[in-house]
């Protein structure tokens, strides 16, 4: 099982990247291959000038194609997810998330930014044809106690992250279940 984690903050370390660090640790403990990407892996010029042939973008797209899921984390600024993340998502092929389970994670100054994930980020993930976009986790700044060292969260946030990661894990495994095609079943019923 392969998962890509994508840190959408233009800064590192950041509160949103600490959520990803926690997720990576949990998934690594479950023998999941985790490939981590952050915006610093891409030359700013490649993102700003839409260089679709950038080596980093090609590698990222190839790894994403082979992945089962994506966990994307972003800070919320002015009621929207990171503009730097948007520039990267705009460069991905139209069906880049086809067949993928996606878990969005976001941080913001206050809970007033909570809906930015649902109304700004999720539509873009959907446009990239994600198979399943999970509810995700939003954390306000007060819930991320330490992000400069080992991530530390309030108990409430830790519980929500654990629940979201469990849901992500279950969704990844649902992808493996082979369900017969409905049309072929109808054909057999009339035979």
Curated annotation (Swiss-Prot):
Broad EC category: oxidoreductase
Keyword entries, A-Z: Flavoprotein, FMN, NADP, Oxidoreductase
Keyword Flavoprotein among UniProt keywords: yes
Coiled-coil boundaries: none
Gene Ontology process terms (BP): alkanesulfonate catabolic process; cellular response to sulfate starvation; DNA damage response
Catalysed reaction equations from the record: FMNH2 + NADP(+) = FMN + NADPH + 2 H(+)
Domain of life of the organism encoding this protein: Bacteria
MF term (GO), any: protein homodimerization activity
GO CC annotations on file: FMN reductase complex
Gene3D superfamilies: 3.40.50.360
UniProt EC number: 1.5.1.38
Induction context: Repressed by sulfate or cysteine.
Protein's UniProt keywords contain NADP: yes
InterPro entries recorded: Flavoprotein-like_sf, FMN_Rdtase-like_dom, NAD(P)H-dep_FMN_reductase, NADPH-dep_FMN_reduc_SsuE
Subunit structure: Homodimer.
Similarity section: Belongs to the SsuE family.
Role, per record: Catalyzes an NADPH-dependent reduction of FMN, but is also able to reduce FAD or riboflavin.
Identification of the protein by name: FMN reductase (NADPH)
The organism of origin for this protein: Escherichia coli (strain K12)
Origin organism lineage: Bacteria, Pseudomonadati, Pseudomonadota, Gammaproteobacteria, Enterobacterales
């Amino acid at each position: 099982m392969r998962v890509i984690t994508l840190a959408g903050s233009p800064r590192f370390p950041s509160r949103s990247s600490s959520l990803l660090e926690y997720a990576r640790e949990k998934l690594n403990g479950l023998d999941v291959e985790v490939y981590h990407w952050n915006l610093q892996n891409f030359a700013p010029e490649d993102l700003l000038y839409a260089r679709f042939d950038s080596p980093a973008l090609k590698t990222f797209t190839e790894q994403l194609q082979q992945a089962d899921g994506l966990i994307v984390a972003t800070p919320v600024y002015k009621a929207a997810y990171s503009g730097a993340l948007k520039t990267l998502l705009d460069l991905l092929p139209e069906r880049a998330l086809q067949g993928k389970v996606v878990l969005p994670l976001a941080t913001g100054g206050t809970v007033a930014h909570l809906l930015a994930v649902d109304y700004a980020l999720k539509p873009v993930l959907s446009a990239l044809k994600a198979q399943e976009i999970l509810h995700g986790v939003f954390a306000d700044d007060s819930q991320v106690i330490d992000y400069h060292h080992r991530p530390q969260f309030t108990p409430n946030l830790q519980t929500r992250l654990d629940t979201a990661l469990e849901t992500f894990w279950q969704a990844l495994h649902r992808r493996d279940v082979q369900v017969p095609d409905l049309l072929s079943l109808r054909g057999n019923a009339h035979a």
